[in-house]
Amino acid sequence: MTLTSKQVQELKSLAHHLNPIVLIGKGGLDEAQLENINKELLHHELMKIKFNDYKSRKEELAEKIAEETGSEIIDIIGNTLIIYRKHPNPEERQIKI
C-alpha cells in the first residue's frame, strides 16, 4: 500500500491527538511486542509507538515494525513513531482515506 502525500498529511493530523499505545522500553522489540502492535493495529488502524529506550535505533526499529506488521510509517516525531495499517475488512475500517 502506497500512500500519497495528501493521505500522509491527513493521517498525521488524525494522529495528532492520539497518545502512544505501545512503549518500547528496555525489554526492546520482541515477538510479544510485535504481537501486541499487530493486535492494536487491527483495532485502531492508526497508532503511536513511543521509544523510551533504543532512541538511537528508532529508525531501524520503525522499519522492522512496519515490515513485520505490514504497516506504513507515517512519521517519526521525536521519539514517537506513527504507523497506519488499513483494516482488512472494508466494513470495519474506521479511517477512510
Label the model's feature ranges.
Residues 1-97:
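Positively charged, polar, low-complexity stretches
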